Amino acid sequence: MYPLKVRITATSGIAAMSINGSTIDWLLDKRYESEKKKGNDRNYSRVENINKRLGDASLIIIDEVSMMGCSKFKELDAMLKKAKNCDLPFGGLDILLCGDFAQLPAVKQTSLHDALVQSTQTYIAPDDHVMAAATLLAKFRKFELITLKRSKRLYQTERTSP
């Protein structure tokens, strides 16, 4: 058996810090866009930087998925395909989405949860980002974990303490 190489990410800096990971924007080298606007992109390879940041990871964990919008999800897929030179979804890497869709939504983008809802409703005409995200999400297997509530944990702690 070989050790699994994992890149841990989150959609926000605070979430990334709490899990000792990085942000999706850092992984996708979003600095490239600002460098391009400044005209400093001549010797700059976004794909090369993404590959360096991925290392030999075969699994990317994304926490706080409720805050990921459809266009960023589509960009993640496109950039990983380029970086890995592979037309499979996400460049052939495994993606583990974590989080609660009932938490904070994506900022200025349609959330992944809304993409799933819109793709199943015939009276809504989703845009390209929404359709792309819904198509990618359809390839995922869904697992629901038991919900732990603070009051339950607190109660259990009180009952078990001496």
Where are these regions (language model features)?
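Conserved ATP-binding/catalytic motifs of P-loop helicase motor domains
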Residues: 1-162
